[in-house]
From Swiss-Prot:
This is Cysteine-rich receptor-like protein kinase 40. Residues 348-619 form the Protein kinase domain. It is found in: Membrane. Keywords: ATP-binding, Glycoprotein, Kinase, Membrane, Nucleotide-binding, Phosphoprotein, Receptor, Repeat, Serine/threonine-protein kinase, Signal, Transferase, Transmembrane, Transmembrane helix. Residues 1-27 form the signal peptide. The keyword Cell membrane does not apply. It is a single-pass membrane protein. InterPro entries: GNK2 (IPR002902), GNK2_sf (IPR038408), Kinase-like_dom_sf (IPR011009), Prot_kinase_dom (IPR000719), Protein_kinase_ATP_BS (IPR017441), Ser/Thr_kinase_AS (IPR008271). It comes from the Eukaryota.
């Protein structure tokens, strides 16, 4: 029975992965000017033209360009199938994609969709302007594999071999050999040191020049590489080209492809012992040489240590600013000298104060080499004790992502516990979003970029990093903004490390900020990635409204937003500075925010779903239900505690 259950789980998981992959590959992108639905002349012309495309592409050697109607409602369509296509497979592929376009892009004039089935890839592209012979490099569609490369793999070696494969495939795909459908296409199969086989496919529409094709494919690779280099495969496409790679064969594209073998291992030293002659008739083998070198090195090391001790006694090392330190897991970081930090901050001068948090004060510092840093000096008795200090040092040392603040090092001399971060010039998000004057600087484009960046940072913590981390204190004051207003998630003192297969944990030690804490965490100490999703939802609603979560007496922002949503008036909560921006896009974010603050944690999305929703104009997003109103219960239970008070307590045993 156990084996049968395990088999059913495996088959269900495999089927789900296949369905996800097919959905990913067949994602239509709608863009450009809008029109008035199916009743418009443009829509009617498109509905007449599209049903003819599948037949036409077959009799035109796999590539067909057509138009129908008169300007300004003229419809242009371009259809293509890949090299070596099966006619039935090509026909079915084009039929499916034209239907997807008609369904998903009812009110947009421009669209493209690269898709496929088991036997072929194909493209359906349409516009109200001629696209033939012109490369189009926006908008991109990028879909990564949901699986990440295991930390046990040699990632550096994998990236090197992956880049080499990209270059080979790109060069071959853009040689423009053959007739229409044979041009600008290359499928390659290669062995990697860390994986048995890697499959890669690149394709452009055959109406382009070789130069345009190379630029287009290069951009596709760039879009994938930028955010998803650690994934086990993925796809990136533009209206004029298509790039996909995976660890398994796809689209029947590799049956007749010769496998490029994995590069040979680096040559080792010859096992045959070589000799060095020292006297006639005598020689020393490598074993003897190694013994001599070891003894010589050991003597030099003793001499060096002696010099260090002598100079240390004379005080010659007092001006050393930092030293490398290794924790119990072998992770290296910098331990800064307290005197150097005191000098950098002008003895923690109030003029250098950047901000005040629940656990300490942050100062700006400048090292003698001109490097600017942010110095967080923990307040004694603040609640962030040794455990939280060591936790933040240990976690941030292992994390590297453009949307996470970078820890440069630490200092723990005497009673002082200090963290040294990269300096982020624009302070934290709360200084902008809740300031009447500065909020106007947060345009719709800037806010969207901040929201998306925070989401990507959380996705990295939850799924993409070598560790699995729950932040537990996500709020606007813990989001720093760099010079270009890109967000960086900060303050990992209360973060919780999960095992790779762990999805949920319980704690008696509750730490965070009331109003941002998920109900199951605040009331029962239950922690999961969905706890961070809840906090993200509250913060997203703050970004849209420009109001603090505690600005609405007795109910909170989520409750207020939900009431307006039910009334059909979600625009009431929109910040007046955003009124002139695309209403549908802003309301979509309100919908996502409400989904993130659902009372039942299983009803909240994952951060990967949030990323997909943010980047798609066509995916149907679920409708939210009433969100959690934990602050109403919490206020009645704990008296006058504010919605924004820091919480650092322990649940009593029951």
């Amino acid at each position: 029975m156990g084996k049968c259950s395990a088999l059913m789980i495996f088959l269900s998981s495999s089927l789900l992965l296949v369905l996800q992959t097919l959905h990913v590959v067949n994602a239509v992108k709608c863009f450009g000017n809008s029109f008035n639905g199916n009743s418009s002349t443009f829509a009617q012309n498109r509905q007449k033209l599209f049903p003819t495309l599948a037949d036409k592409v077959i009799i035109n050697d796999g590539f067909y360009n057509a138009s129908l109607g008169q300007d300004p409602d003229k419809v242009y369509a371009l259809v293509s199938c890949a090299r070596g296509y099966d006619q039935d497979a090509c026909y079915n592929c084009v039929q499916s994609l034209t239907q997807n376009t008609l369904t998903d892009c009812r009110s947009r004039r421009d669209s493209f969709i690269w898709g496929g089935n088991d036997d072929v890839t194909c493209l359906v592209r349409s516009s109200n302007q001629s696209t033939f012979g012109s490369v189009q490099l926006k908008p991109p569609v990028v879909w990564p594999s949901p699986d990440t490369i295991e930390s046990s793999k040699n990632i550096t070696l994998f990236k090197q071999q992956w880049e080499e494969m990209v270059n080979r495939t790109l060069e071959a795909a853009t040689k423009a050999e053959g007739s229409s459908v044979l041009k600008y296409y290359k499928a390659e199969k290669a062995g990697f040191t860390e994986f048995p086989d890697v499959y890669m496919l690149m394709q452009c529409t055959p109406d382009l020049s070789s130069r345009d094709c190379k630029q287009c494919l290069g951009d596709c690779v760039m879009y994938f590489r930028k955010d998803y280099m650690g994934r086990k495969g993925g796809m990136a496409s533009l209206p004029s080209c298509y790039f996909r790679w995976d660890l398994y064969s796809f689209h029947n594209a590799f049956d007749n492809v010769t496998r490029v073998p994995a590069p040979p291992p680096r040559p080792h030293a010859q096992e045959k012992e070589s000799c060095i002659t020292v006297k006639k008739g005598k020689s020393i083998g490598y074993g003897g040489i190694i013994a001599i070198v070891v003894v010589f090195t050991f003597i030099n090391l003793l001499v060096f240590i002696g010099f260090i001790k002598v100079y240390a006694r004379r005080g010659k090392l007092n001006n050393v600013g930092s030293a490398e330190y290794s924790d119990s897991d072998g992770q290296f970081m910098l331990r800064f000298d307290l005197g150097m930090i005191v000098m950098a901050t002008d003895d923690f001068s109030s003029e250098n104060t950047l901000g005040q948090g629940g656990f300490g004060t942050v100062y700006k510092g400048t090292f003698p080499n001109g490097q600017e840093v942010a110095v967080k000096r923990l307040t004694k008795g603040s609640g962030q004790g040794d455990m939280e200090f060591k936790n933040e040092v240990s976690l941030l040392t292992r994390l590297q992502h453009k949307n996470l603040v970078k820890l440069l090092g630490f200092c723990n001399e005497g009673d002082e516990e200090i963290l040294v971060y990269e300096f982020v010039p624009n302070s934290s998000l709360d200084h902008f979003i809740f300031d009447e004057d500065k909020r106007s600087l947060l345009t719709w484009e800037v806010r969207f970029r901040i929201i998306e960046g925070i989401a990507r940072g959380l996705l990295y913590l939850h799924e993409d990093s070598q560790l699995k981390i729950i932040h537990r204190d996500l709020k606007a004051s813990n989001i720093l903004l760099d010079a270009e207003m890109n967000p960086k998630v900060a303050d990992f003192g209360t973060a919780r490390l999960f095992d790779s297969d762990e999805t949920r944990a319980e704690t008696k030690r509750i730490a965070g900020t009331r109003g941002y804490m998920a109900p199951e965490y605040l009331n029962h100490g239950q922690i999961s990635a969905k706890s961070d999703v809840y906090s993200f939802g509250v913060m997203l609603l703050e970004m849209i409204s420009g109001e603090r979560n505690n600005s609405f007496e007795g109910e909170g922002l989520a409750a207020f937003a939900w009431k307006r949503w039910v009334e059909g008036k979600p625009e009431i909560i929109i910040d007046p500075f955003l009124i002139e921006n695309p209403r549908n896009e802003i309301i979509k974010l309100i919908q996502i925010g409400l989904l993130c603050v659902q009372e039942n944690s299983t009803k909240r999305p994952t951060m990967s779903s949030v990323i997909i929703w943010l980047g798609s104009e066509t995916i149907i997003i679920p409708l939210p239900k009433a969100p959690a109103f934990t602050w109403i219960r919490s206020q009645s239970e704990s008296g006058a505690m504010s919605l924004s008070d820091d919480v650092f307590t322990e649940l009593s045993c029951r």
